[in-house]
Amino acid sequence: MPENVASRSGPPAAGPGNRGKGAYQDRDKPAQIRFSNISAAKAVADAIRTSLGPKGMDKMIQDGKGDVTITNDGATILKQMQVLHPAARMLVELSKAQDIEAGDGTTSVVIIAGSLLDSCTKLLQKGIHPTIISESFQKALEKGLEILTDMSRPVQLSDRETLLNSATTSLNSKVVSQYSSLLSPMSVNAVMKVIDPATATSVDLRDIKIVKKLGGTIDDCELVEGLVLTQKVANSGITRVEKAKIGLIQFCLSAPKTDMDNQIVVSDYAQMDRVLREERAYILNLVKQIKKTGCNVLLIQKSILRDALSDLALHFLNKMKIMVVKDIEREDIEFICKTIGTKPVAHIDQFTPDMLGSAELAEEVSLNGSGKLFKITGCTSPGKTVTIVVRGSNKLVIEEAERSIHDALCVIRCLVKKRALIAGGGAPEIELALRLTEYSRTLSGMESYCVRAFADAMEVIPSTLAENAGLNPISTVTELRNRHAQGEKTTGINVRKGGISNILEEMVVQPLLVSVSALTLATETVRSILKIDDVVNTR
């Protein structure tokens, strides 16, 4: 009877007899959360594994509106994936961080993180505490960075051949790899023109503007020292101006409007005539002031309130032989000013000759039946900026070409930041695995075990490269291990030839910063995921 009462009146008090059961259930929950987080994050890594390397596959992504993207750039794939699980979202952020830091290696970093998480699962199942795993991984990372730095070789920015090889390696895994002989030199030239090789420590990629224009093929891509705009020249008569004096205005060349709540009542035609005459005189006065400064090319910022340029103003500008390009986007203003040395003018009273930029030539160029481009070249006081014009037969090709060029530019930026190169083709990862395994033998206890697991996880990159290239991953990785054990540090997988060779001789190289950043960011993310033992939903 007393037992019945106890069971009816709710859960038993936590006496010494049944404290164990409740505590055991609590102890079980963090482990479940951890495994759930790890499996969600691993699912994301597995999704993009097949797109690693030159023989990697591409993904076709369709968004809600039906727009299609074809790419094998890890950051782009993950950005467009709808990931709901918070731990999986951490891997998307990881890829984004790698894209910002290095610009390349966005797929590798996620695959390394996935492999490290796989190792964590095995260690956790053996009963090793997450904190011990986390601290051991940090030790392994520090040792790993030393190993990578030892493997690297310094590079000079004057060594053009090496820069080209790095850019080509980056482009080889892209859809546009067959055009790497055109795009690599273009990327190297672009970066070299916007920096001073002797003193530069970074590259501001905003100084390299990529303009996309539909039509033609990727062979028609070009590098322009100057400014290229996709907007058309507004007045049809003037298409070429030599010794151009260029003004950039942010106000409208049209009749001023009343406030929203004001009205003008016109009772007869004489009053109407007066309004029109006043409008004509107002616009003519604006145009005369522009002409007085010596301006013969006028760029007008896009306006959302009213017409930036009325027909009447265009008529007067045409008469005064001033070339007009309207609808300049607000975000392009800074680049335009830096390129041609002009200053934006917000009011006609500030429009003076010293606000103008000057250039040898401003012209509208026809593109063999696929539209027109407006070019300004031969700037007299050029800022260190260049424009890359990307052409392609359809939107998908142009967008992928733009992403590929961006990656190649980022690779060269990495070399400017950290002037060291490292072999590609899975060579650094195999070397890491080998050297960290040796290092683990010098440690004792659980640490040794965890560092060994970290080392084994590094083999995922060469294994995936081999798998994607149609080679046998097990025999390839085993042979790589043997060759590295014999001291051949730069031996890696030559995907093009389908075998193992000295990767440095094949000129498959990547910046040290890409590998260092990938290893650091992947380890940090894995340590964060390991430390999470509960997920709390809030409203």
Swiss-Prot record:
A Pfam family of the record is Cpn60_TCP1
Record: residues binding ADP:
53, 105-108, 172-174, 425, 510
Its GO CC terms are:
cell body; centrosome; chaperonin-containing T-complex; cilium; melanosome; microtubule; nucleoplasm; zona pellucida receptor complex
Among the GO molecular function terms of this UniProt record, one is: ATP hydrolysis activity
Domain of life according to the entry: Eukaryota
User: Where on this chain does Mg(2+) bind?
Assistant: 104
For this protein, the record's SUPFAM superfamilies field holds:
GroEL apical domain-like, GroEL equatorial domain-like, GroEL-intermediate domain like
Residues holding ATP: 53, 105-106, 174
Q: Which UniProt keywords apply?
A: Acetylation, ATP-binding, Cell projection, Chaperone, Cilium, Cytoplasm, Cytoskeleton, Disease variant, Hydrolase, Magnesium, Metal-binding, Methylation, Nucleotide-binding, Phosphoprotein
PANTHER family hit by this protein: CHAPERONIN
Protein name as it appears in the record? T-complex protein 1 subunit delta
* Organism, as annotated: Rattus norvegicus
Q: Which gene encodes it?
A: Cct4
